[in-house]
Each structure stands twice: as C-alpha cells, then as structure tokens.
Amino acid sequence: MKIQHIYQRIKTTFSILLIFTLLAITLILTSIFLLDYIKPDDLLAVDNKETLIVNNINVVLVNTNQILKNRQLVIDKGIITAINETNLASSSKARIIDGKGAYVTPGLFDMHVHLYDRKYLMLNLAYGVTSVRNLNGKKMHLRWKKELQNGEWLGSNIYVSSPILAGAGTHALNQQVVSPQEGRSQVRKAQSNGYELIKMYGYLSADIYEAIIDEAKKVNISVAKHGPHPAKGADWSSLKGLQSLEHVEDVFQGPLNYQFDHNKLRLIAQKIKALNVPIVPTLETFKHLTQLSNDKESFINTLDLDYLNPLHFDIESHFTVSRWLVDNSQQSAYHVKKLQFLLEIVKVLNDHQVKLLVGSDAGTMYTLPGIATHHEMQLLKQSGLSNFEVLKAATINAAQTLAIDQRYGSVSVGKVADLILVTKNPLDDIGHLETPFAVIKNGQWLDEAKLKALKSSAKDNESYFWSVINLVEDLLTRAAF
C-alpha cells in the first residue's frame, strides 16, 4: 500500500511537471510567432515627405578634402536634389531652415557593431551614425531591417551579416562549421535567408575557410573575416576579394605572434596592402578592455549602462567583463602597452595606404552604440590619421566597401540625404561630429530636441522576457539552419 502511494505521488508530480513543460513550450513558441508583430510603442516615426531647404551651410567634400562655403541644400523625397551657391531655391510648400553656417558631412558608418536591441539603432542615429554593419546576424536583425525599409520606425540603416561561422568548439551563439561541405551549405543558406554578407572567424581550418570563400563567390555574397591574416595553412592570396578584415589586434596575435616587432609589422603591412581589402581596426573595444583592466569598477561607474539591453548586459557581465576585472597590475600594464602598439599597427597600415574603415565593435564589453563610433574615430586620429582621413574612413570608404557609394557616402546631388550638421569644422577636429546640432535621416530633419528624444527612448529598451525569446528564436533557427 505504501509503495502504491509513493508511485501515485510520483505519477502526479510527473504529470504536473509535464503540464508545466508543455505550457512553457507553448508560451515560448507562441511568443516566437509574435516576434513579427510585437514592437516597442515609443519608436519614433518616419516623417520625410516634405521638401527640405537648408540655407547657409558649408558642405564638406569627403573625396577632395574641400569645403563648399555658403551653400544651399535642397532635399526632396529623401534625395539631395541641389547644392546651390546661393539661396536660390524657395517654395511655399518646402520647409526652409537656416543652417546658421553649419558644416554638413555625410552620415557616419560604423562597420563593426553587435546589435542586441532595436533601440541601439535609434541611439546610433542620435549620434549621427546613420548606417551600421552588424557582424553577428540573427533573424531579429533581418526583421528590424525589413521594418526600417518599410518606414515603420526611425533608426540607422542596418547591413546584416550571417551568423558567425566558427570552427569546432565554438560557443552556442555562433554557428559551428566542422567540414568544407557544411561551410558551403551555411553560405548558401545565409544567402537564401537574406543575409548580406558572411562573417567567419579566423580559426577555421584552411579547407573549411577556402570552401566558404569559394562558395560565397559562386552565390555572389561578400565575406568579412575576423583577423587580418590567412587561416592556418592558407596563403595570403586567399584573402583577396573579401569585403573586409576585422581587428588589428589579430595582427598582433596572429602573424606577429604576440611580439612587438616593428620590422615584421612593416612586412605584414605590405602583404595586407597587396590584398586591396579594407581593414576595420576596432581599437575602441580594446581600449575599453584596457580601461576595465586598469580602472575596474570606477570605469564602469562612468558608463551609462541603462542603454544596454538587460539580457545582453547580464551575458557580457558574466562571460566577458568579469575576466578583465580580476587582472593584476602587471596584466593591466601589459594591456596599456599593447594598446599603444595597436595604434602603431594602424599608423603603419595607413602609411602603407591600406584602406581603413571605422568599426567600434559596439555592443561588446559595455561599449555603447553611437558614442563608441566617435571614440573609435578619436583613436584612429591618435594613430596618426588626419581629421580628413578619419572622416573618409567613416563615410565614403565604408560606402565603397559596401558597394553603395552611388547612393551614400558623400554630400552629392542624387544621393540619399543621410547627413550630419555640426557648428564647427570637423576637418579641424573630428571630435566636433560627436555633438551634432542636427541630423538628417533620409530627408527627415532631426534637431537637437529630436536627437535628445532618440537618446531618451533608447534607455527604454526591450524587456528581459522578449530578449530571451529572441535568443531562443536564434538558437532554434540555427539548429535548423
């Protein structure tokens, strides 16, 4: 009788657990289905139908290092239709704005970010970063891109890579690839699912690495590679034709083998120059690491962490940031020395006329969207680039890399009106771009009040629940990917 009673209790407990499990699965699957329909209710609206005339502005030419002074800018349906020498155009139907002598540059591109929240795109826009390239694509990013293209809300343009293709032993948030055949399959699936480029890590074996590049050429999709060096066993020539190479830190960790070798660095720079492939240094993320290592909690206290997605904040706290907070003084000093050498690597690459791009790695280690882009630009300047060279890296170089320079990347008639207006000349100090008094997004005028509203809304990010649902969607999608 006693055994029968125990058996009955076990059976009842199991039934309850089964019911709760089924309910949880139903809730998760239903929530995933609803992701296509659920959006925050405080996203700013797109409103760019009016013709815009901006008088009394100075146009910065990113191709020639010149300024066209005292111009009038005419924008219609999001396109620059005229740049007049005087205030010629006038219309009762147009919105006329006095530019008050502002300097106008193209909107900035951040070519290496990690997006974990729609609000990151709003925060980027508030800082004049009108386009970003997200290098760890998920289904949610394709969803956000479609929403932006449909004009459902106001945010930066987004270019979305595939999920990161990585070798055996990678963590669950990457797509593991263990054979050349699987590499080819992942490329085809990424292309058919709407991703715009392939992102692959550098420690893939040479045969997988070469298979991915070969298949990408066949289906006409670009490839960005982690680390400006070939995979082990592959030739430098295998890197030709890639869209970009990421992280100068990997020059130090890869071909330099952790040696502060200036002579060998110059030889490597010659090899990189011969590739004709742009480099994205991502200095800001290493500087952030260095500050975490040296100043620890006192540095964290200076950051406005309310801008970070709550789930992403927890993941970064436990799996990334925590490792640098336990560094001893010797390790901290090493990071300072290494950071200075990374600046030297960028200088040598620039001296060898390697095309450089601005990419902050924003989203890693508490780096904040938007402001991280400007920090990256300042670090490029510290590396020896002129203000003009930094501006080129953040605008026309990026547009050329993405093959969209016929529509973006300069202030020119016929191009999309994604622009920044600042009160002081950015060719005198690139830091002036950090505080725009206005941004124009696809022809929509965003004054200081609107930019402030974007920043304010960006703090009200996605809930923990919906962030988890997005994560589960990604894991399930890639399990079937």
Predicted features along the sequence, with ranges:
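N-terminal Sec-pathway targeting helices
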Residues: K2-I25
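Histidine-rich, glycine-flanked metal-binding segment
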Residues: L34-T51, V59, N63-T105
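Divalent-metal coordination cores built from histidine and acidic residues
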Residues: L35-P40, G99, Y103-V104, L121-H229, ...
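Acidic, glycine-enriched loop/beta-strand segments at the rims
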Residues: D41-L44, V59-Q72, E85, S386-L391, ...
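Divalent metal-coordination and catalytic microenvironments
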Residues: I57, L73, G78, G101, ...
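Structural recognition of alpha->loop->beta junctions
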Residues: G194, G233-N257, E376-V390
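Active-site neighborhoods of metal-dependent hydrolases
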Residues: Y195-L197, L256-S383, L475-F481
